[in-house]
C-alpha cells in the first residue's frame, strides 16, 4: 500500500494499493487495461483538491500529469487547447501573461484543467461553461478519443455529463477554451462590484480575486482542506419569501428559472459554527464554507462535522446542504450527500 496523503489537499490518512503518475495517453491506456484484467478499481486524481478519502482505496490511483497548452487565435477570439493535467491557477496566470482576459474571475480555484468541466467550476459570476469551447475525452474501454461540444457537456451548477454518463471508464484528456478579444469584465459579486467597469483591467480583477480568496481560504499546506465543502443551495421562490421575512438581510441570487440561490457560508455562519470542532476537523474561523483538518483529523471526523453542519442549517432554515467535495470509498466514489445525512 502507498500513502495518498501527499496527493490530496485534505491530507487525511489514506492509502492505495498502487499510485501511478500518468504523463502520456498510451501509458494511461496500458495501466487501465492491466487494472481491468486484474479486476482492480481505478481512480483518477488531478490535484486531489476536491476529494475526501473515507477509507483506503483498494485499487490503483492514477495521477494526471498530462501537460501542455496550445494557443491559436482569429480576429475575434483566443483559442486555448489545454491538456488536462495542467494546474488551473497556473493556466489563469499564463493566460494573463499572454494578455488574454476571461479567466481572471476563476483565479486560485484549486485543481487541474481536467477537473474544471467535471465540476463546472465557478466563482465571482463566471463558470467554466462560459469559457468552454469543447472537452476531449478518452473512452478507456474502447480505446477511442472523442470531442464534446459545450452543449453536449450538459453543464449545470457544479454539474456536468462527466458526473453521470461519462463518470466511469472515461477521462478528460484536454479542454478547449474560447476567450473573446473584446474582453468584458464580470463585476457582479463581492468587492468586484466596487470597480469602475469602464476603467478596470483583467489584472486588477485577478489581483482582487486572489487577495479575497487568500484572506478567506486557508492554505492547504497549513490546514488540510478541499476549498468550499458545500454547494450553495438553490431553493424555490416561495421558500425564499418565507426566509426573507425572518432574515431580511439574507444574501440571495435569483436564478433564470425563478428559483433562488443562497450563500451556504452565510447560512452556516448564522448557526454560529465558525471554529466548531469535532476531533481534528473544524469549521474554518474566517470562512464557514470551508472545513479544515487541524492536523490529525480522520475522514470520520470530517464526515461527522459535515453532518452536524448540515443538520444545524436544516434545523434553522429548512435548507439541506449538499457536499461539493467528492467522497471516495474503498472501491470508488460514493454518494456524498447520503454519507453526511
Swiss-Prot record:
It is an enzyme of class 1 (oxidoreductase). One of its GO terms (cellular component) is cytosol. It catalyses: UDP-N-acetyl-alpha-D-muramate + NADP(+) = UDP-N-acetyl-3-O-(1-carboxyvinyl)-alpha-D-glucosamine + NADPH + H(+). Pfam families: FAD_binding_4, MurB_C. InterPro entries: FAD-bd_PCMH (IPR016166), FAD-bd_PCMH-like_sf (IPR036318), FAD-bd_PCMH_sub1 (IPR016167), FAD-bd_PCMH_sub2 (IPR016169), MurB (IPR003170), MurB_C (IPR011601), MurB_C_sf (IPR036635), Oxid_FAD_bind_N (IPR006094). It is found in: Cytoplasm. GO terms for molecular function: FAD binding; UDP-N-acetylmuramate dehydrogenase activity. The active site is at 158, 228 (proton donor), 324. Pathway: Cell wall biogenesis; peptidoglycan biosynthesis. Its cofactor is FAD. SUPFAM superfamilies: FAD-binding/transporter-associated domain-like (SSF56176), Uridine diphospho-N-Acetylenolpyruvylglucosamine reductase, MurB, C-terminal domain (SSF56194). Residues 12-182 form the FAD-binding PCMH-type domain. GO terms for biological process: cell division; cell wall organization; peptidoglycan biosynthetic process; regulation of cell shape. Keywords: Cell cycle, Cell division, Cell shape, Cell wall biogenesis/degradation, Cytoplasm, FAD, Flavoprotein, NADP, Oxidoreductase, Peptidoglycan synthesis. Its EC number is 1.3.1.98. It comes from the Bacteria. Cell wall formation. Belongs to the MurB family. This is UDP-N-acetylenolpyruvoylglucosamine reductase. The gene is murB.
